Amino acid sequence: MVEKMNEQIYIIPLRDVKRSPRWKRSNTAMKDIRAFLAKHMKSEDVKLDASINEKVWERGSEKPPRKIRVRAMKFDDGQVQAELAQE
């Protein structure tokens, strides 16, 4: 049985996404979210929930949100699972 180690809520800024080409912005945002969580949770094994994907791609490829609120849970085996935090 894998136990939950810790749980954090992060507000991830996505303003650097605006530097990438317009048609790549949502792809870049997903990569940035994964990299942010890997850095702050100190784990390379990051799984993103479908709710995060839906929120980023909600307005298409060219207009991702400026920031996103995420709940990340790190388990004893080092895996990080992230989902969209409820307001």
UniProtKB/Swiss-Prot annotation:
One example of a Gene Ontology biological process annotation: cytoplasmic translation
A GO CC term attached to the entry: cytosolic large ribosomal subunit
Keywords: Ribonucleoprotein, Ribosomal protein
Domain of life where this protein originates: Archaea
Gene Ontology molecular function, alphabetical: structural constituent of ribosome
InterPro entries xref list: Ribosomal_eL31, Ribosomal_eL31_CS, Ribosomal_eL31_dom_sf
Pfam families assigned to the protein according to its UniProt record, in alphabetical order: Ribosomal_L31e (PF01198)
Keyword DNA-binding belongs to the record: no
Segment forming the signal sequence: none
NCBIfam families in alphabetical order: PRK01192.1-1
Similarity field: Belongs to the eukaryotic ribosomal protein eL31 family.
PANTHER family: 60S RIBOSOMAL PROTEIN L31
HAMAP family attached to this UniProt entry: Ribosomal_eL31
Protein known as: Large ribosomal subunit protein eL31
Organism listed in the record: Methanosphaerula palustris (strain ATCC BAA-1556 / DSM 19958 / E1-9c)
